[in-house]
Amino acid sequence: MKVLVDIDEYAEGAVLLDGLESAIVGIVQEFGNGNRVLYSKQRILEILQERDLMTMGEAEEFYDYNILGLYAGEQNAVFLDQSLEPIKNKENEWEYHAK
């Protein structure tokens, strides 16, 4: 059963990015600080390309300067970059490869 959650109540005071609601993937909890909204970087880049007709390069530049670079207080949004893939090497140690 899915439960509808009001992000404003669940992460009261957290910064929400207008127009990027479909890129929300979760809530980050940090001891001593309020909850923050977690966005998928890859989904944000897809939205910018689809909605705003940006190239990947334009979307990445816009993301870096206008979204990642935004500071709106202690409950600023945080971003998940899933471009690394953990793989065990022959010595049974973890290595990380770009997807």
PLM region descriptions:
Residues 1-99:
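C-terminal alpha-helical interaction appendages
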